[in-house]
Amino acid sequence: MEFNLRMADTIHDSYEWINLHTCASSRCMAEGRRIPFFHNDCFCFRLYDISDALVAAGDYTFDPPAYEKTRRSHRIKRILALKLRDKLQIRLPAETLMAIAGLLVRECAAVTAEEQSLGTKVSHHTVDLTQDVYVDYTIVDGVRYVKSLGNTVPKLCNQDHHMLLSKQGEPVGKIWIAEDYRGIRSVKFCSADASLAGPTPIVKSWWRAISAPCDIEKITIRSDGLKLRDILIYDETIPNNTSNYVGWANPEHPNNVIDIMTFDQVHSFPERLLMTCFNCNANGITGYTAVTSGSSVAMIHAHENDNTGFYADMDAAYPRGFFIHMPLDDGEFVTEVCRRYALAAGKWISACLVFITNKGRNTLFGTSGPPESCPVLDRILTPAPNGTQIWFNDSTSVHPKSVRYLAFDELAPPVQRPFPPSLIPNPPYFWTQNTEPWFVSSCNMKGIVDMTLCRDTTLAHRPITGILLEYENGHRECLGQFRFDKTLKKVRVEHTTDLYIGSLRTTCSYLYIADVATSPLHDCGSLSWMRVSRHGTLEWWSSLRHSIVRYTSDTGQLTNMETRT
């Protein structure tokens, strides 16, 4: 039976005698059992009846990263290509095998999940930690998970597949768990005061620790029949602490977490909070990129080793996010991390971050507000010049998606400081004509020697979205939305050469920058060119629809607002 599903709608299936409610809010999901849905092709392709174990094995502990679907597909394709090479009677090139495997990824995943779930069942059982504890592993889509924990080795199992995790009589005060959205990947037992320092072999997973005031004697294991999904302390006298379910990207992390909306230290955590980090002021850092919705920050990345692969992950997680890049000069480092708290467009509460450096650079990772919204900043952290690890919540683990929780060593009360004058905009007239968020960046035109343009070729009109400018003294500035995965060649600019900014409008009349050159391009007759001299200030006002530039000098002010469709 086919249904035309709409959100917040309930459909009655008279054949199965069930109601399908499509709200999917947390309240509705908690009130009743969720109904599993399958692709129609996968359901028709099934070899066996859908079992509870199969549904449980495919259930997610928490929402997976946006990029995980692609990574899982690539893993399955590589595994399947190797199997095809071994099974086929003819020898085919690796490229051909990968192409064939790419057409069978979904079918391979469906059949493998069915076969692995045969003969298994969802179960809960107790493990005595005062006795020997054995661990067994399984492979799911090329990823290793913990299959079972127990006090004995099953007689029919090969003992070489089981490992002794803990010996009888060894006290257990803390349990380290590495997991991803599909299950538990590693378990470590240790004493209450022990840390799990150093590198671990578990990548792309989240670490959390279960601890108790006294030694843990018994635990309850929850399994989906294929792999472990949760571990609980088997003692009703010990409260279930919400911090036991905070996942960290590394087992070595600070313990104090603050809420940047209230500056209160967090003791009761949101369900399945995930914390990741970036290295501030570490050796080799050349700048920072933040993704923002305007009223809040969603993600912060520290640039090192010229890696651009993270952009694909950011695009998948935040398809409508705005990218703000803050470059660093030689010898420059962040001296203050501050919070800007204000009312954003539409009266939304805005809690953005501001980075201030030792060379006077001030960068607001968020939308610019009117002057009355910029009274003071709250300094949250003074990073060490030789490096500080700053932890923030993965925005997909909270609602709304934004950075709300921070963690770092040596927490201190926030300190108010004056708002940097460079971050207080002089709003143009279009500021008051709509409520969409505007992102402002500016630069001095004197002394520029190089510029690198950033063009978004994924859009039909291929706009210039940002510029990285380099000065004769080594200083660097960014205008607009600059990304290193969309850059064009660096252009040398002579000291006396004016810049020409060519603008156009889309079919919806949205203004954008089509080109930036040292002379107007005559073969682009439809462009509206704006001449910018090598003195004065150039501002770039960006929204999710428009790119407006404004040039101010002693002789007056120019904008590209007069550009026609």
Describe each model-derived feature in a short phrase.
Residues M1-T565:
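Lectin-type carbohydrate-recognition ectodomains
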